């Protein structure tokens, strides 16, 4: 699990990343836009997305919906971060849902690879090292649960 300092850093980070619905929508679009730009092969997992969605994650309904859904899921984890059993259950649920779609732990590692760049862009370079490390630890936990 995560230690107390990591949990605190995640909660602080979430005040910016998940402040409200429009913020989560914007940040979800930003994160997936970076993922698709950096690792175009990851698009294969999004069979319901068309070229317009990939090109404009922040303006298409499907793109915005996926972004806000992902950030809502992250928000559930962070809101529950002090309950290790709940966080573990949420991580396993996320894993089951993604494995069913052919998304592997290696694919999650690609998301982890772009996450620090995402944090810098989403926070206008105001994310602290502690917040980046805590977000990385949460992603590592999700990857480990993804079996």
UniProtKB/Swiss-Prot annotation:
Subcellular location: Cytoplasm
Residue numbers binding heme b: 66, 98
Limits of the Globin domain: 1-147
Highest rank taxon of the organism: Eukaryota
Record bears the keyword Transport: yes
Any one GO MF annotation of this record: metal ion binding
Entry keyword set: Cytoplasm, Heme, Iron, Metal-binding, Muscle protein, Oxygen transport, Transport
Alphabetized Pfam families for the sequence: Globin
GO cellular component terms listed in the entry, alphabetical order: extracellular region; hemoglobin complex
UniProt family annotation: Belongs to the globin family.
Binding partners and assembly: Homodimer.
Protein's name in the database: Globin
């Amino acid at each position: 699990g995560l230690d107390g300092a990591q949990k605190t850093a995640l909660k602080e980070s979430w005040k910016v990343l998940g402040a409200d619905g429009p913020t989560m929508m914007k940040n979800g679009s930003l994160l997936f836009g970076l993922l698709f730009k950096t690792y175009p092969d990851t698009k294969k997992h999004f069979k319901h997305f068309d070229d317009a969605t990939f090109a404009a994650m922040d303006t298409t309904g499907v793109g915005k919906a996926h972004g806000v859904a992902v950030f809502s899921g992250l928000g559930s984890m962070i809101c529950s971060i002090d309950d290790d059993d709940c966080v573990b259950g949420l991580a396993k649920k996320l894993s089951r849902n993604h494995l069913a779609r052919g998304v592997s732990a290696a694919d999650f590692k690609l998301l982890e690879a772009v996450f620090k760049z995402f944090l810098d862009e989403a926070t206008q370079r105001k994310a602290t090292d502690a917040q980046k490390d805590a977000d990385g630890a949460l992603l590592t936990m999700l990857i480990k649960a993804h079996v």
